[in-house]
Amino acid sequence: MRTLRRNVTENRLTISRRRTEKKTSPNKTEKSVQIPVDIIIEILLRLPAKSIATCRCVSKLWISVICRQDFTELFLTRSLHRPQLLFCCKKDGNLFFFSSPQLQNPYENSSAISLKNFSLCYKISRPVNGLICFKRKEMNETVTVICNPSTGHTLSLPKPMKTSIGPSRFFVYEPIQKQFKVLLSYKSDEHQVLTLGTGELSWRIIECSMPHILGMSEICINGVLYYPAINLSSGDYIIVCFDVRSEKFRFITVMEEFIKAAHDGTLINYNGKLASLVSERYCFVDGRSKSIELWVLQDAEKKEWSKHTYVLPAWWQHRIGTLNLRFVGVTRTNEIMLSPCYQTVPFDVYYFNIERKTMMSVAIQGMEAFQGHLVFTYLDHVENVKLLHNMF
């Protein structure tokens, strides 16, 4: 018979092994091996988040190490240096998540790894530090849910104080205080905010001095949420800037030549600056598209934007045909990424190198079962192993 005893001290993990030959044998041997916790952490850091979630079920010892704040923060920091592509497939009202390495040099095919699936979900937000926010039907009610697609953990948020039809939900992050927040925006001067990590899940009403109608795109950059809107009082096109930390709104009036890019394009993070990608078909690109425009906000106070036009290669029309592509964003190596709106076989994503003016495609394998279904692609997804209930 063999038994295994493990203890965790402040700086050292003790593993004791006892081997008993027979009940009648007076001879017993016991060996103890002490392994520093930092070595255990280093081993765990090499595992994917999906495996970390499984390790929590092994023993109290394992979960005590994995739940340490220094471990979860270090795991997230390392994940930031190895970003992934996140794919979300919608089928029969369910969401299915897959991840794939985000290639620094996209010259070869890649395989997507199945993560988790969630039922009766819609209205998906962009990933924020490994987490996603969406709406889901629970007990005939619509609730806001925070989920970790890598571990499968979910947390349903309480009902907002105001239940106006169709409020827009924004999931945002403030990097200085490391706080997640959910913003509900209505067609009025009143909005609601819920802060995660305060120990109490409750909505607060915040005021906005400019009632507005929201547009279709949004992006959070360095603690500021940007989204297009229309001023209800004047009818002007604007960009709303919500400071996540102070919870204050400010507004950028959109110049006439930028209206198409701001309201019909895709807002993105371009090297820490607000930018927009747009084509002749607005936020979509197909075989008929001739070029891509990149607008970058250079000075918010002066409302200065720079415009860059990139001509698509000659083979584009023949290769793409009637396939509809979405703008995903710009990679850290300055490549514009495009992805199909629906799962196709083969499923190719495209990288347009801004500096070399070249286009490359990468085939993503592993999602063939979802052919013909809606798929969303996200850049710079990271794995987060922090338990959701520890964030509130």
UniProtKB/Swiss-Prot annotation:
TM spans (from-to): none
Pfam families: F-box, FBA_3
Disulfide bonds: none
Domain F-box: 29-78
InterPro entries, sorted: F-box-assoc_dom_typ3 (IPR013187), F-box-assoc_interact_dom (IPR017451), F-box-like_dom_sf (IPR036047), F-box_dom (IPR001810)
Name the UniProt record assigns to this protein: F-box protein At5g65850
